[in-house]
Amino acid sequence: MSGQAKPTFYLLRGDDTTRIKEIIVGFQAGLGDPSMADLNTTRHDGEALSFETLQADALTMPFLADRRLIIVENARAFLTKMAKDRTQTCLDLFENLPETTALVMVVEDQQAKKRGERYWEHGKAYAWLTDWMREHNDR
C-alpha cells in the first residue's frame, strides 16, 4: 500500500446510473489484475443483505491483493431496514473498516427542490449515515 491511507467507505448517491457504473469500474480497475479483482470483489443487493453478511465480508482479508471491494447495490433498502438500535453497530463497522476494504454503498436517489432548497428525496431514510459522514469525512 502507498504511504497515504485510502478511503474505506464510499457513498455513491444519485440517479445517474451510467456514471455510478463508471466509478465502480474505476474502483475495480484500481484493484489491479482483472482476475484478482474479480476474486476480491463482492456484490450484494441491499434488499437481501444482512448486517452479519456485510460485516463478515468487510472484515475478510483480500486474496493476493492489497484491497478488496464490496459493492452494495440498492443500499437504500439495506440502510432503511436497519433497526434504530443497530445503526450505531453499523456505524462502528464503517468507522473501523480495515484499510484493505473499500465498501461502496450505491443509493439511487434524486435531488428535488422545495422553496428554493435542494434536498435528496429519500435522504431522511438514511440521514443517520449522511450525518455520520459529515462528521467523519476522512473515512
What do the predicted segments below correspond to?
Residues 1-139:
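Conserved beta/loop motifs at nucleotide-recognition and modification sites
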